[in-house]
From Swiss-Prot:
Gene transcribed to yield this protein: fhs
Name of this chain's protein: Formate--tetrahydrofolate ligase
Catalysed transformations (reactions): (6S)-5,6,7,8-tetrahydrofolate + formate + ATP = (6R)-10-formyltetrahydrofolate + ADP + phosphate
Domain of life of the source: Bacteria
Pfam families for this protein: FTHFS
Gene3D superfamilies cross-referenced by the UniProt entry: Domain 2, N(10)-formyltetrahydrofolate synthetase (3.30.1510.10), Formyltetrahydrofolate synthetase, domain 3 (3.10.410.10), P-loop containing nucleotide triphosphate hydrolases (3.40.50.300)
Length: 559
C-alpha cells in the first residue's frame, strides 16, 4: 500500500489558485471579491443582490448516519461530491459551515474535509478565518452588556433580573462558565444576578445570521430577540434596548459569504456555523441561495446524523428560505455499521460481516426518515482501507433490500476520480424530478405536537415527556403568537434516543424535554432534551495538548 499522507501534508502541498480566479469560474467579478489574503475572500452584498434574478441550480443535501467515534466523513463526502460533479462537467459549488474553535481544541480536530477531498486554506478555516465568529460573539455580548447597563442606570424597562434569559457566549469549550453570578463586587458593578455562558455556535445571533436573507432582515431579526421578561411576564426585546442597529453594524461584513477553494480548485462557500445538536446545524441561507444562482448544482451538508441535521435542514432552513432540495446523499461507513452492530472501536479493523448486517438497522432508519420528506436519496459508502469486499457487499445488499442504491466512494484517497459514480447517480436523481419535498409538520400544529411528531416519526420513540412548567411555557408562547414557529431539537447526536450509548435503531423510548428556549429572532423554539449542554466542556486530554508551532513556524497537531 502506498504511503498515506496526513490531511495537513496534503493541504500544504495543494496548488492553490488566486481567489480571484476561483471567483471568475462562477462569474464573480474581481471588484466584487473582498480578499482576505490571496486564498479567501468575501462576496460583496452588491453582487449577491445582482444575481437574485438568475435561475436556481439544484440543491443536494449530504447527511449521514448517527456519528460514531470511527468517523463518517460527511464534510469529506460533501467536498468530494462537489469536485466529482465538476469533474463530470457540471458547474458545482460546495456550501459548508465554518469551524468552531472550541471543538478544535477539544475533541474534534479540524473540520474542512479530509484526504484528497478538502477545502483550503485549512489552517485559516479552523482558526480565525475571516473573523465571522468574532463578530457574532461580539454582537451577542454587546447585547449582554447593554442589558446589565440598562439595569444599572435605573431599569426604565422594568426588567425582572430573575428573568434575564440572554446568556453570554464565547467560542471555546469551558464548563466552568455554564452557570455563574455576575455583577458581584458592590454597588459600582451593578445588581448581582444569575447568568452563564453558551458556546458561540449555540448563540441565537449565529442562527439569525445564518437564516437572514439580507442586512434589513438581519436587523429586524436582531430586534426581535427576547432578552428578558418583566414581573408581569411581558417580554423585553433587543430593540427596546436600541441594540439592534449597533449589532447589525458589527455583523455587516460577517453577513457576506466567504469564498475559498477545494484541493481541485473548485469553489466552496464557507459561511456560518451553528451546531446541529444544540442549534439548527446548517450553513447560511445567503451562501446557499447565492450559490444556487451561480451553479448547476450546490452540494451542502447538515451537521451530525439525518435525525438532527437533515431534519432541521428540511424543517427549519428549507421551510424558512423556500428551498427545495432535489436529492440527498446519506454517508455511511463499514466501520460505523460494525460499531452499531456492537463491535468495539479497537476491533473495527477485523472483518465482521454479521456485525455489519446488524448495524445496518441504523442506516435503514435514516433512509426511511429521508423518505418522509419526499426527497430521493442515495447511500455513499465512504471507503476505508480496512473495509473488505464482503463487508461492502453486505452493506450494498442491505441498501438494495430497502429499495435504494449504495455507491462505494474513494474520494478520500483519490479525490474526484474516486467519486464519479456517485456524482453521476446524484445527477440522475436530481434530474429525474422525483423530489416531492415537504416539511414533516405544518406551521399551524401546536408546539408540543411538533415535538411529539419528531420524536415518534424520526426518533421512533413512544412520546416526548415534559413537566407542567415546560408545557405551560410552550402554551404561553403559543398565546403570544409564536405557535407557528418550527421546533429545533437539542439532543445527543450519537443516538435516536437521548442516551448516547443506545446505538442501532431503538424504538419505544421516551424523550425527556428538560428545558425550552424561545429564539424569536431566529424564528424557532429550542427544545433541550436529555443531558445535552449548550456550553460543552473539554475532555481529560484535550486536543490542544498536541497543537504547537514547529521550527518553521507551521502549525502542527490541529488536524
Amino acid at each position: 500500500m502506498a504511503e498515506v499522507k496526513s490531511d495537513i501534508e496534503i493541504a500544504r502541498a495543494a496548488k492553490k489558485k488566486q481567489i480571484q480566479e476561483i471567483g471568475q469560474k462562477i462569474g464573480i467579478p474581481t471588484e466584487h471579491l473582498l480578499p482576505y489574503g490571496h486564498d479567501k475572500a468575501k462576496i460583496s452584498a452588491e453582487f449577491i443582490k445582482s444575481v437574485k434574478g438568475n435561475k436556481d441550480g439544484k440543491l443536494i443535501l449530504v447527511t449521514a448516519i448517527n456519528p460514531t467515534p470511527a468517523g463518517e466523513g460527511k464534510t469529506t463526502t460533501t467536498v468530494g461530491l462537489g469536485d466529482g460533479l465538476n469533474r463530470i462537467g457540471k458547474k458545482a459549488i460546495v456550501c459548508i459551515r465554518e469551524a468552531s474553535l472550541g471543538p478544535n481544541f477539544g475533541v474534534k480536530g479540524g473540520a474542512a474535509g479530509g484526504g484528497y477531498a478538502q477545502v483550503v486554506p485549512m489552517e485559516d478555516m479552523n482558526l480565525h478565518f475571516t473573523g465571522d465568529f468574532h463578530a457574532i460573539t461580539t454582537a451577542h455580548n454587546l447585547l449582554s452588556a447593554l442589558i446589565d447597563n440598562h439595569i444599572y442606570w435605573g431599569n426604565e424597562l422594568g426588567i425582572d433580573t430573575r428573568r434575564v434569559v440572554w446568556r453570554r457566549v464565547m467560542d471555546m469549550n469551558d464548563r466552568a462558565l455554564r452557570e455563574m453570578i455576575c455583577s458581584l463586587g458592590g454597588v459600582a458593578n451593578g445588581f448581582p444576578r444569575e447568568g452563564g455562558f453558551d458556546i458561540t455556535v449555540a448563540s441565537e445571533v449565529m442562527a439569525i445570521l445564518c437564516l437572514s436573507t439580507d442586512l434589513k432582515d438581519l436587523e429586524k431579526r436582531l430586534g426581535d430577540i427576547i432578552v428578558a421578561y418583566r414581573r408581569d411576564k411581558s417580554p423585553v426585546y433587543a430593540r427596546d434596548l436600541k441594540a439592534d442597529g449597533a449589532m447589525a453594524v458589527l455583523l455587516k461584513d460577517a453577513m457576506q459569504p466567504n469564498l475559498v477553494q477545494t484541493l481541485e480548485n473548485n469553489p466552496a462557500f464557507v459561511h456560518g456555523g451553528p451546531f446541529a445538536n444544540i442549534a439548527h446545524g446548517c450553513n447560511s441561507v445567503v451562501a446557499t441561495t447565492t450559490a444556487l444562482k451561480l451553479a448547476d448544482y450546490v452540494v451542502t451538508e447538515a451537521g451530525f446524523g439525518a435525525d438532527l441535521g437533515a431534519e432541521k435542514f428540511f424543517d427549519i432552513k428549507c421551510r424558512k428560505a423556500g428551498l427545495k432540495p432535489a436529492a440527498a446523499v446519506i454517508v455511511a461507513t463499514v466501520r460505523a455499521m460494525k460499531m452499531n452492530g456492537g463491535v468495539k472501536k479497537e476491533d473495527l479493523g477485523k472483518e465482521n460481516i454479521e456485525a455489519v448486517k446488524k448495524g445496518c438497522a441504523n442506516l435503514g432508519r435514516h433512509i426511511e426518515n429521508i423518505r418522509q420528506f419526499g426527497v430521493p436519496a442515495v447511500v455513499a459508502i465512504n471507503h476505508f482501507y480496512s473495509d473488505t469486499d464482503a463487508e461492502i457487499q453486505a452493506m450494498k445488499d442491505y441498501v438494495a433490500s430497502m429499495g435504494e442504491e449504495a455507491v462505494l466512494c474513494k474520494h478520500w484517497a483519490k479525490g474526484s476520480a474516486g467519486i464519479e459514480e456517485l456524482a453521476n447517480k446524484v445527477v440522475a436523481l436530481a434530474e429525474s424530478g422525483a423530489s416531492q419535498f415537504a416539511p414533516l409538520y405544518p406551521d399551524a400544529m401546536p408546539l408540543f405536537e411538533k415535538i411529539n411528531t419528531i420524536v415518534q416519526r424520526i426518533y421512533r420513540g413512544s412520546e416526548a415527556i415534559a413537566d407542567k412548567s415546560v408545557r405551560d411555557q410552550l402554551h404561553a408562547w403559543e398565546q403570544a403568537g409564536y405557535g407557528n414557529l418550527p421546533v429545533c431539537m437539542a439532543k445527543t447526536q450519537y443516538s435516536f434516543s437521548t442516551d448516547p450509548n443506545l446505538r442501532g435503531a431503538p424504538t419505544g423510548h421516551t424523550v425527556p424535554v428538560r428545558e425550552v428556549r424561545l429564539s424569536a429572532g431566529a424564528g424557532f423554539v429550542v427544545i433541550i432534551c436529555g443531558e445535552v449542554m449548550t456550553m460543552p466542556g473539554l475532555p481529560k486530554a484535550p486536543s490542544s495538548e498536541k497543537i504547537f508551532l514547529n521550527e518553521a513556524g507551521q502549525i502542527e497537531g490541529l488536524f
